[in-house]
Amino acid sequence: RVLTEAPYLPRCSDDKTATRVRPREYAIRYPYMQVNRPGFVSWLIFDLDHTKAMIWEDAGLPAPNLIVRNRQSGHSHLYYAIPPVCTTEAARSKPIAYMKAVYEAFAARLAADTAFPRGPVATTPGHPWWLTHELHAHVYELGELADYVDLAVSSPWGKGPQFDEVSHSRHCILFEHLRHYAYSIVNRER
């Protein structure tokens, strides 16, 4: 499924920079590649920066489809297959928000790196650099995954202004106040 859901020309490289674009038949030869197509998410990938790859059992979560483990450090990526969710500008915002809520709830339970999904690449399953374990081929519905966690309801713009993290000039404080107000207006108009 990784090969069929990957883009035809995924980004790939020998490191996390994803500097090359190759056909997927060649991209799987690189240790890092783009597994989700642009504009679609078919895999929820969790980056575990600890050595407990089986933490999903202790957390009471369903088994991932794939576990891709680093041979040296023991860190791993957990891959959960889901039906493709469109993330383009033409997509509906509710399914995207639902997918993000499920992802964040799983990431919290798995003690996963929450900054991981910002990049396009992940470890390539089956590459010789990694130990890859395929547990099953089941494709999880988002509702099925959501049954295992409590979804937090949060605003899309965060927790509000963090005045301790900005400089104390009046311009920065004014910007922090206004940007959250603007986010609420934009969200209401969508």
Q: Whereabouts are the PLM-identified features?
A:
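Signature for HUH/AEP ssDNA processing cores
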Residues: 1-76, 82-97, 116
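Generic low-complexity, intrinsically disordered sequence content enriched
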Residues: 7, 13, 25, 135, ...
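A residue-identity detector for tryptophan
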Residues: 43, 56, 129-130, 157
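Generic surface-pattern signal
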Residues: 61, 107-115, 183, 187
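A signal for specific C-terminal beta-sheet/loop modules enriched in small/flexible residues
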Residues: 68-72, 93-104, 174-189
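Modules that initiate DNA replication and primer synthesis
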Residues: 83-88, 145-190
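Flexible helix-coil linker/hinge segments at domain or subdomain boundaries
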Residues: 100-145, 150
